[in-house]
Amino acid sequence: MGRIAALTRNPVMIALVAMLAIAGCASKKTPNNAADLGLNGAGAATPGSAQDFTVNIGDRIFFDTDSSSIRADAQTTLARQAQWLNQYKQYAIVVEGHADERGTREYNLALGARRAAAARDFLVSKGVASSRLKTISYGKERPVAVCDDISCWSQNRRAVTTLSGAGS
């Protein structure tokens, strides 16, 4: 009891306790609309910007296990990408191929290369100039989700279309 009495007589401790009590009572402002998030409304990225591409078009597609075949949902995304890329021709494009953590490094690099090539070929089939496109495989080296679970693995089986040049 002597310690507590000594602490309550210390002005620094009293001030510290008071500040903690006040801070604990303060309400936290949480963003509740797009303006608070700095987006100025959904999809408010400047048309033709790299942010516009990522936010409004979608920069990635996903693959089934051990596959480089373009799924129906991925075809929709790639078709939107091609339309956007054909409208905004100032960008150079790199298609990154990725794989999940299962398999050897060599196998996943080759699988990532096939995925990037499949996405590139689809974009070319929709009119995007092949001279603007490059591919790279990261295999399993750059996961977006890390855990030993199918939900993580499925997020890592992807191709990502990245833009460079023109103020991206």
From Swiss-Prot:
Lipid attachment, kind N-palmitoyl cysteine: C25
Record's signal peptide: 1-24
Chief location of this protein within or outside the cell: membrane
Coiled-coil segments on the chain, per record: none
InterPro entries per UniProt: Bact_OuterMem_StrucFunc, OMP_bac, OmpA-like, OMPA-like_CS, OmpA-like_sf, Pal, Pal_lipo_C
Domain of life: Bacteria
Lipidation (S-diacylglycerol cysteine): C25
Compartments in which it is found: Cell outer membrane
Domain OmpA-like: 50-167
Any one cellular-component term (Gene Ontology): cell outer membrane
Keywords linked to the UniProt accession: Cell cycle, Cell division, Cell outer membrane, Lipoprotein, Membrane, Palmitate, Signal
Gene3D superfamilies for this protein: OmpA-like domain
Membrane topology: Lipid-anchor
Any Gene Ontology biological process: cell division
Family of the protein in this entry: Belongs to the Pal lipoprotein family.
Function statement: Part of the Tol-Pal system, which plays a role in outer membrane invagination during cell division and is important for maintaining outer membrane integrity.
Oligomer and partners: The Tol-Pal system is composed of five core proteins: the inner membrane proteins TolA, TolQ and TolR, the periplasmic protein TolB and the outer membrane protein Pal. They form a network linking the inner and outer membranes and the peptidoglycan layer.
UniProt protein name: Peptidoglycan-associated lipoprotein
Organism: Mesorhizobium japonicum (strain LMG 29417 / CECT 9101 / MAFF 303099) (Mesorhizobium loti (strain MAFF 303099))
